[in-house]
């Protein structure tokens, strides 16, 4: 029986400034709504956001390690390379 993987690392792109936001959650749709409603302090001034990437993990530590890696300089470079063909607009910055 295939169970859905509970932990998600996600990347959002701001329609306002093109910047990317990297996060981790167990409920992607709820979290996206929070970012787009302005209830998330880290992204309130940069909304609206579009989901541009997500990965699911079986364990919380694995997801957290991936989130931390994507926020490093080498992780940001790897992410930009992965997403360069699919982003609606070039990323102006990476934050998270």
Over which residues does each language-model region extend?
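GIY-YIG nuclease catalytic motif and its immediate N-terminal context
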Residues: 1-50, 54-57, 61-72, 76, ...
